[in-house]
């Protein structure tokens, strides 16, 4: 049988990991262990990503907590393997997190991870697409959050269509992005405003802690725009990521 997997952060990232996770670093290590074992086996994390899990994924996601208010309810759209939703829940025990994911194999992993990490009091998993859970139907309950997060899911215009209806008025959407953030914010600002959002703002998170800093696009929901019920919500749950 293979020996235990060492999922601790590499020495050069130990200070950043301790800064971002504090006394819950052991819990973050336990989650990392699930990702580099079951996550890889189930195809949720690529084998090449495992060695760079801490710098490219865990610390990158944890840095975004600085944009999330104390005690917020967070809805994470397209959670996949739990990035960023589970990371946020690990780093911030004050948050209430809902992981939204349409694919069965991913939701199965998330449910098991929440159980193994003993996060059931603050985290729950909902199988469905963002368009469905925003309006409910087909066995999917309507959801809203103070903050709605997404990472590596889609271009900003589509993300806004999916995420803004889930944000409570006055709340915010926080999309973790890369080098394209400023360009996307400018390109899709008009679409965002038609959907009830304010001007997209680009923020750098974790400056001085992680390198490179985590880039996020933040959009405040300024007004409510009617959300049409998706055809899939009238039939059955499923389909591709949404």
UniProtKB/Swiss-Prot annotation:
SUPFAM superfamilies registered for this protein in UniProt: S-adenosyl-L-methionine-dependent methyltransferases
Catalytic EC class: transferase
Xref: HAMAP family: 16SrRNA_methyltr_G
GO MF entry, a single one: rRNA (guanine-N7-)-methyltransferase activity
Entry EC no(s): 2.1.1.-
Job of this protein: Specifically methylates the N7 position of guanine in position 518 of 16S rRNA.
Protein name, per record: Ribosomal RNA small subunit methyltransferase G
Cellular localization per UniProt: Cytoplasm
Protein's UniProt keywords contain Cytoplasm: yes
Binding site residues for S-adenosyl-L-methionine: 78, 83, 130-131, 151
């Amino acid at each position: 049988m293979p020996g235990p997997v060492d999922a601790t952060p590499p020495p050069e990232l130990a200070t950043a990991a301790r800064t971002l996770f504090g006394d819950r670093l052991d819990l973050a290590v336990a989650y990392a262990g699930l990702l580099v074992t079951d996550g890889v086996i189930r195809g949720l994390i690529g084998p090449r990503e495992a060695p760079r899990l801490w710098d490219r994924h865990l610390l990158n996601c944890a840095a975004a907590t600085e944009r999330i208010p104390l005690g917020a309810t967070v809805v994470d759209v397209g959670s996949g393997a739990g990035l960023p939703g589970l990371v946020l829940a690990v780093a911030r025990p004050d948050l209430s997190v809902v992981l939204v994911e349409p694919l069965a194999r991913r939701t199965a992993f998330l449910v098991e991870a929440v159980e193994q990490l003993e996060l059931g009091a603050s985290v729950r998993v909902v199988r469905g697409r963002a368009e469905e859970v925003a309006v409910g139907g087909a066995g999917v309950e309507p959801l809203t959050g103070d903050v709605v997060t997404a990472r590596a899911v889609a271009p900003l215009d589509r993300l806004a269509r999916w995420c803004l209806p889930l944000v409570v008025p006055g709340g915010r959407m926080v999309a973790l992005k890369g080098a394209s953030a400023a360009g996307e914010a400018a390109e899709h600002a008009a679409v965002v405003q038609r959907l009830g959002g304010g001007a997209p703002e680009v923020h750098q998170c974790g400056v001085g802690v992680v390198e490179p800093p985590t880039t996020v696009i933040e959009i405040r929901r300024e007004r409510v725009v009617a959300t049409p019920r998706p055809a899939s919500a009238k039939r059955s749950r499923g389909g591709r990521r949404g």
